[in-house]
From Swiss-Prot:
One of its GO terms (cellular component) is cytoplasm. Its EC number is 2.3.1.234. This is tRNA N6-adenosine threonylcarbamoyltransferase. One of its GO terms (molecular function) is iron ion binding. Gene3D superfamilies: 3.30.420.40. It is found in: Cytoplasm. The lineage of its organism: Bacteria, Pseudomonadati, Pseudomonadota, Betaproteobacteria, Neisseriales. It comes from Chromobacterium violaceum (strain ATCC 12472 / DSM 30191 / JCM 1249 / CCUG 213 / NBRC 12614 / NCIMB 9131 / NCTC 9757 / MK).
């Protein structure tokens, strides 16, 4: 069964081909990062227009890479939500038009389910059940995953997502958009001992998290340093980046360990863009070695938004249940509302 996946929820256009017998056959991705950098953030209207420009050429490139034709497709999956309404509409329009013309099923996919299942595209693959740490620019959640569609949210951020906190803090430090990845790179050269920032809700007694207060703490620290020395020098900026990243990582790791104890699970799956963070991976790998559990990640290329995860999630939905179909988008969509298969 050959499934075409289309991702267009925000500022990446992703198209991929997944075969249930042979695995991922082709994967094409275009990022709009450079286009939005001029504005310091994602401009929804520009994002939608760029998806329109890119979706068909990327699909053609994907088919060519795999040596396939449209007539070979058995189904088409698309990101139904959550995301930017106009951007989602591009993928939904294309998927439904192609599926109608080819007389094949169309499969709406939850964007976060795509992220959750993306580590199953790696090798070795995690087995159900597992605990998932979903950590991205828009979401930070801890979930018990017992099967496709069987998700229980155990804890989540009560304000900013971890990736959002990275980007906002980078902006406070004067780093160019997108600042989160650059902040992480600068943190690698920062001193681990010079500054210490708070760990919000680390001892809250539940699995929820909070990261908005870290921005305020960084702003206070920046003002203190500027008052003492004038403009921040590069080393001070790197040291602040290090302190910020260490605070985020410690909260994510300790909350994940607590969630695993609560759920009684020995497998941890990390998904989402922040899952590519080197310090987070190192800390989780160290914890896994000490606590004797297994940790799984998607391939680095599939940590960001991509069509491969949508094609795979769509294939799983098609394999185990009738696709919902219908020309709809859901810019706001609770993952826990998905039916299990």
């Amino acid at each position: 069964m050959l499934v075409l996946g289309i991702e267009s929820s925000c500022d990446e256009t992703g198209v991929a081909l997944y075969d249930t017998e042979r695995g991922l056959l082709a994967h094409q991705l275009h990022t709009q990062m450079a286009m939005h950098a001029e504005y310091g953030g994602v401009v929804p209207e520009l994002a939608s227009r760029d998806h329109i420009r890119r979706a068909i050429p990327l699909t053609e490139a994907c088919l060519s890479e795999a040596g396939k034709k449209l007539a070979d497709l058995d189904a088409i999956a698309y990101t139904q939500g959550p995301g930017l309404g106009g951007a989602l509409m591009v993928g939904a329009s294309m998927a439904n038009a192609l599926a109608f013309g080819l007389n094949i099923p169309v499969i709406p996919v939850h964007h976060l389910e795509g992220h959750l299942l993306s580590p199953l595209l790696a090798d070795p693959k995690p087995e159900f059940p597992f605990l998932a740490l979903l950590v991205s620019g828009g979401h930070t959640q801890l979930m018990a995953v017992r099967g496709v569609g069987d998700y229980e949210i155990l804890g989540e951020t009560v304000d900013d997502a971890a990736g959002e906190a990275f980007d906002k803090t980078a902006k406070l430090l004067g780093l160019p958009y997108p600042g989160g990845p650059l902040l992480s790179r600068l943190a690698e050269s920062g001193s681990p001992d010079r500054f210490t920032l708070p760990r919000p809700m680390l001892h809250s007694g539940n699995l929820d998290m909070s990261f908005s207060g870290l921005k305020t703490a960084v702003l206070t620290l920046v003002r203190q340093q500027e008052s003492a020395q004038g403009e921040l020098d590069e080393q001070t900026r790197m040291d602040i980046c290090r302190a910020f990243q260490e605070a985020i990582v410690e909260v994510l790791v300790k909350k994940s360990l607590a969630a695993m104890r609560q759920a009684g699970m020995k497998r941890l799956v990390v998904a989402g863009g922040v899952g590519a963070n080197k310090q987070l991976r190192a800390a989780l790998n160290d914890a896994a070695a000490r606590k004797r559990f297994d940790v799984f990640y998607p391939p680095l290329a599939l940590c960001t938004d991509n069509g491969a995860m949508i094609a795979f999630a769509g294939a799983m939905r098609l394999k185990f249940a009738e696709p919902a179909g219908g020309f709809t988008i859901k810019p706001r969509w609770d993952l826990s509302s998905l039916p299990a298969v």
